[in-house]
Amino acid sequence: MKWIASLLLSTVCFFGYGQQQLSAVSDGINRVNNDLLTSWLNDIRPEGEDLSKVEGSPYFLDEWVYGKVVSVRGERYGDVRLKLNLYQKELMVQPLNSKDSFLMDDSKLLQFAFVGQDSTHTFVRVQKLEGQKPEPYLDFYQLLVSGNMNLLYQPIVEIREPPKTTMATAGGRGAGFYSREDNFYLYNGVSLEEIKGARKPLLKALGRYQKEVDRFISDNKLKPNKPEDLIKIVSFYNQLN
């Protein structure tokens, strides 16, 4: 996850939430209440598989980072540090000036952000609208570009065994965390469409202004399969709307 965490994104500030446009979070003013917590990590850790021997890191960022949280009811919370386990899909929270850690109840979360000095990494939950009723909230996605068309990235971490040849040359190295890095989506407030980085499918998914976007890609020699170029393309598309 280092590449996406260190990518210099067009930074959105923290959050207002519109039907189509997602944005990132205004100052949190309250401390997280107990309704948003599922367990006290120092006390009641849910039982699971032993990950102590798995190489690498399952976290979006390895260190605790100052963050903000927004609940599905629109409540905003600050004064916390956050840590996101991508393999177990768990958001951990630690109040400032405290060593106690808690698990967040993700069913009650709408958005959260890691707030750094140089950039803010925002995660959102989105809904697909079918007919008159919205579907249940989906998993969290990292918000890379905000606008009429939002560019989202779904970080997925898996555990994989190394190839036998690698195990032999690496002295029997064991399983490690592996990050899938091709999970990009376009979200317009109604539909969520996965994009694989190929030029023609991307233009079709964007819908409008295909000629203008195609010319922008050619003039700037961009490659839609590169995350930094994909961000530029979707940002340009939003300028046309």
Predicted feature locations:
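Short hydrophobic/aromatic-rich motifs at helix boundaries and adjacent loops
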Residues: 5, 37-40, 184-187, 202-205
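Bacterial Sec-dependent N-terminal signal peptides
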Residues: 1-24, 233
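Exposed alpha-helical structural elements
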Residues: 3, 24-32, 36, 108-109, ...
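Long, compositionally biased interface segments
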Residues: 194-241
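Extracellular/luminal recognition modules and glycoprotein regions
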Residues: 40, 45-47, 54-65
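N-proximal short alpha-helices
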Residues: 49-53, 175, 186, 203-206
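Aromatic-patch recognition
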Residues: 61-62, 67-193
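Sec-dependent signal peptide cleavage junction
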Residues: 17-50
